[in-house]
């Protein structure tokens, strides 16, 4: 059995921006401290929610270094270093390891339309090049590429391939992965509305967008499940559904950055080509935040 990088709720943290569009490292530091104070179990930096596609190489590596330094060993730091260019992913992954990241989050190659054999070769090459755990990231709605259970079972034989973040939204697919891989691969939910279903299939937690605005709550969904308080965990999961729906009423991370700004954080805007949500989406999110209790 592979020891999980974390158990519980990891925040897929936003990258706050200044008004001139540069990364607001001071605010990132404040958010990191607040997340840890509210029981976040790990921090994922430079993921989808962190706007990794529009960060420069310098910003990407600096965000990882800054987060490692700020977290200071209090929680694991997982660096998003995936790419559709294997050579580049290896470079970025080795840099993140050298800068102190505890693990890597590696999205499947996108746009290239590689085969399952290509995925095996891609991930094996990255895992061979580093000495820290690799969490694979399956999100076919964004990448057009789906990691099959058979491919994951083969990849799980590699000692550095520790887990998969499963964001297909297909709970049957998750069940097939769990059956195919057993204890050789940890599974994390990549969907906030499917935390409890995935835990019921043996999952170890969630890499969460919701946790940006409700870190303690998201942690508690997992903690209560692992403590045997499954009815309470389920109740909390269901209560959060309207808020989760609102957080994904537009392309992530547009709504969650709006919500963070609304809560008083200096999250800033998303970088182009992402633009602000419509007034209707903002109103939906405002209502959901009020009903959930985030706003008075």
Each language-model region and where it sits:
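Active-site beta->alpha loop and helix N-cap motifs at the rims of alpha/beta catalytic domains
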Residues: 2-11, 15-144
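Catalytic alpha/beta core domains of metabolic enzymes, predominantly
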Residues: 128-129, 142-248
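Short, amphipathic alpha-helical "lid/cap" segments that border enzyme active or binding sites
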Residues: 25-32, 149, 282-289
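A general structural signal for well-ordered alpha-helical segments in protein cores
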Residues: 28, 60, 64, 89, ...
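Glycine-rich phosphate-binding "P-loop"
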Residues: 138, 160-161, 271-272
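C-terminal alpha-helical cap/extension of soluble enzyme domains
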Residues: 5-16, 38-40, 200-203, 207-296
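Short helix-capping segments at alpha-helix termini
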Residues: 69-75, 99-100, 130-132, 157-160, ...
């Amino acid at each position: 059995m592979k020891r999980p990088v974390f158990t519980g709720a990891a925040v897929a943290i936003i990258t706050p921006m200044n008004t001139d569009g540069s990364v607001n490292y001071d605010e990132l530091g404040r958010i990191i401290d607040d997340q840890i104070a509210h029981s976040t179990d790990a921090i994922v930096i430079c993921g989808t929610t962190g706007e990794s596609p529009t960060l420069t190489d310098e910003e990407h590596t600096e965000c990882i270094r800054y987060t490692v330094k700020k977290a200071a060993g209090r929680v694991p730091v997982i660096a998003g270093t995936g790419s559709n260019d294997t050579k580049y992913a290896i470079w970025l992954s080795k840099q993140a390891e050298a800068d102190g990241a505890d693990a890597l989050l590696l999205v499947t190659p996108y746009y290239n339309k590689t085969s399952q054999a290509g995925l095996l070769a891609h991930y094996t090459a990255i895992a061979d090049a580093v000495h820290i755990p690799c969490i694979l990231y399956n999100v076919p709605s964004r990448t057009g590429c789906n990691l099959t259970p058979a491919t994951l079972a083969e990849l799980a034989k590699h000692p550095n391939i520790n887990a998969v973040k499963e964001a297909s939204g297909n709970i049957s697919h998750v069940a097939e992965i769990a059956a195919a891989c057993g204890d050789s691969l940890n599974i994390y939910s990549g969907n906030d509305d499917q935390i409890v279903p995935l835990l019921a299939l043996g999952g170890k937690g969630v890499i969460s967008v919701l946790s940006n605005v409700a870190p303690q709550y998201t942690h508690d969904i997992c903690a209560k499940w692992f403590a045997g308080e499954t009815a309470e965990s389920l109740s909390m999961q269901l209560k959060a559904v309207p808020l989760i729906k609102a957080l994904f009423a537009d392309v992530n991370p547009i709504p969650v950055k709006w919500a963070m700004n609304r809560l008083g954080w200096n999250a800033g805007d998303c970088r182009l080509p992402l633009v602000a949500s419509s007034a209707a989406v903002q109103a939906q999110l405002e209502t959901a935040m009020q009903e959930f209790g985030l706003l008075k």
